[in-house]
Regions:
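Extended, non-catalytic structural segments that build the interaction scaffolds
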Residues: 42, 51-62, 274-308, 325-348, ...
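Extended, charged amphipathic alpha-helical segments
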Residues: 200-334, 364-367, 384
């Protein structure tokens, strides 16, 4: 049976009966050990710059790395940030056609989390986000789940349940969480379980029922993972470690020939003199190869992977004047086109996440929200000259694309509502004063203003 792009964490069950579900949960707990995805864990390590030594050290003899530590770079998170520009600017979320401040105040760190989530989804090929309500702090919080198992009823394409591993006090005993949705009259379930399939209630939920009726997990899936970026990060780290070793050995390795056994250990130093027997030699031997060639070979690895992912690299030593905003836009055209494709994927994710948030807030009696939801992803901007920026803003203002209020927020996004109202009030008064001074006045008005009437 061929597996065309399907996750190894996809679990099929024959029906929705509790017995079938629990049997699948037991199998899933055991399969977590057998199907642990090394590539995914490696990608996570490179993205978060953690545990990198263990990935590099295995490619070197133990004696080699006693000379220099492994080289650790940050190319993987930089690739991910450069490629995923969908949340580069904060998304504008509209409920019933307008910004809902009550909802926005409840969504804790949503912009930061969605930005990180999008980068991981692109890198791993698939990622999950769990929405949860923190009753102690009265807010919605979000947790990124890189590795989740999906449960499908045979013949269906939409999962009805998810499970994922959580931290446990005893690291030798794994613990998991299970969520299933209410479907076909069967109540959803929610509980923790261990590798043997023993279930445990979550907090006071002794009946192990899903209080929301839906699974509070949203998902983004790409057609492929970007593991080539992780592998390039590993190759670059290995190559740079080799270069560091080469630099260390450039001073040369002292070599003696013609010495008798027992005379091989000598003290080095400029204040030590060596008396060599007849026929013996002493010199320093340095490794061959050009460091410039090694560096260029390493850069070519990064360039190749960047091109394959619609990216480009501008190296620090690149000369010439800085490119203009339009030139940058042309150079980034492939990445901008890829971003347009990403919008459809993340628009669906945003709607799924909002429906989950809406349901959670209703169950906790916090807020009732409209079903009408829209998201406006911020446009990618490129640097402009002051003249170009003024002309652009002036054109938008003249054509009613932006208002004076938008213009003030453009220059000071952190301006409070009170500040904004004061500024707008001052601008209106100034405009009114200018308008009055330019209006023709009657003879009576000029008399009141202290001017003598003119004869017609």
């Amino acid at each position: 049976m061929f597996n065309f792009g399907k996750s190894v964490n996809r679990i099929l069950i024959p029906d929705l009966s509790e017995q079938a579900v629990l049997s699948s949960v037991v199998d899933a707990g055991q399969n977590y050990l057998a199907q642990k995805n090394y590539d995914m864990m490696e990608s996570l390590d490179f993205y978060y710059n953690q545990n990198l030594d263990k990935h590099i050290e295995q490619w070197f003899a133990s004696e080699s790395l006693s000379q220099v530590p492994p080289f650790i770079g940050s190319c993987v998170p930089r690739f991910a940030k450069a490629r995923m520009m969908i949340y580069k600017e904060n998304a504008k979320r509209l409920i019933a056609g307008e910004v809902n401040d009550d909802y926005n105040q409840l969504t804790y760190r949503i912009n930061t989390k969605t930005r990180e989530f999008s980068e991981l989804a692109w890198l791993l090929g698939c990622c999950y986000m769990k929405s949860m309500y923190n009753e102690r702090k009265n807010r919605l919080e979000y947790e990124i789940l890189p590795n989740v198992q999906e449960y499908y009823v045979r013949g269906e394409t939409e999962p009805f349940a998810y499970s994922y591993e959580i931290e446990n006090v005893d690291p030798t005993k794994k613990r998991f969480v299970f969520w299933s949705e209410e479907r076909d009259g069967v109540q959803g379930m929610h509980f923790e379980y261990d590798e043997k399939g023993y279930r445990f209630a979550v907090k006071e939920n002794s009946e192990m029922i899903n209080p929301y009726g839906i699974v509070p997990i949203s998902k983004v899936a790409f057609s492929k993972a970007s593991y080539d970026v992780t592998r390039a990060g590993l190759h670059i780290a290995i190559a740079m470690t080799e270069i560091a070793l080469s630099v260390r050995f450039r001073l040369g390795q002292p070599v003696f020939t013609g010495l008798e056994e027992g005379q091989s250990k000598l003290s080095a130093g400029i204040d030590n003199a060596y008396i060599l027997p007849e026929g013996a030699t002493f010199n320093y031997v340095a490794p061959g190869g050009s460091l410039i060639e090694l560096i260029e070979a390493t850069k070519s690895m990064a360039n190749q992977v960047a091109e394959n992912n619609q990216l480009r690299i501008r190296w620090g030593e690149s000369g010439g004047n800085a490119p203009s905003g339009e030139a940058l836009r042309i150079m980034e055209i492939e990445n901008l086109e890829a971003r347009k494709s990403d919008e459809a994927i993340f628009r669906e994710f945003e709607h799924d996440r909002y429906e989950i948030d809406r349901r959670i807030l209703e169950v906790h009696n916090i807020l009732t929200l409209s079903e009408e939801y829209a998201v406006d992803f911020g446009e990618v901007t490129f640097p402009m000259s002051p003249k170009e920026e003024r002309e652009m803003l002036s054109w938008k203002l003249d054509n009613n694309i932006i208002s004076q209020k938008d213009l003030l927020l453009y220059y000071n996004p952190d301006m409070s509502e009170e500040e904004l109202e004061m500024k707008m009030s001052g601008i209106m008064q100034e405009n009114q004063t200018v308008a009055n001074s330019q209006q023709p006045q009657s003879s009576f008005q000029r008399i009141l203003n202290g001017a003598s009437p003119t004869s017609s």
